[in-house]
Amino acid sequence: MAIEINNEVVHTPPLPSATVMLLRDAPEGLQVLLMRRHAASGVLGGVHVFPGGKLDPDDLAHPSPDVPAALLTALAEPALDAATAAALYLAAVRETWEECGLRLDVASLWPWSRWITPRQPSVTNKRFDTRFFVAA
């Protein structure tokens, strides 16, 4: 399947999202879980990706006491309020469960990076402000 290039500058603000890179050590070396998105998906259909997705309203509406303060601090983003930081962890756990049936403990997630989809033309007309987490 060929990916179509979006030729327009994207003016919408990026949506907060979370992605999990699941890693495990194996005798033959490091293994990484990638999933193939459904071809009809509106974002990167047919492409291999890490499990993840945008924050749902429920992620913010129901703050969880399961996210330790040390993990919120680990995001190292002074401008990020505690409720949104906790929601990012919850979204990472929820999306991993929804997309591949793996139930992660919040404490197993470690912040790795933050990527924001550019406004310039690219492979999608949607923008995301994604926090990447590693779980091993």
Task: Pin down the residues of each PLM region.
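N-terminal leader/linker segments that precede catalytic domains of diphosphate-processing enzymes
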Residues: 1-136
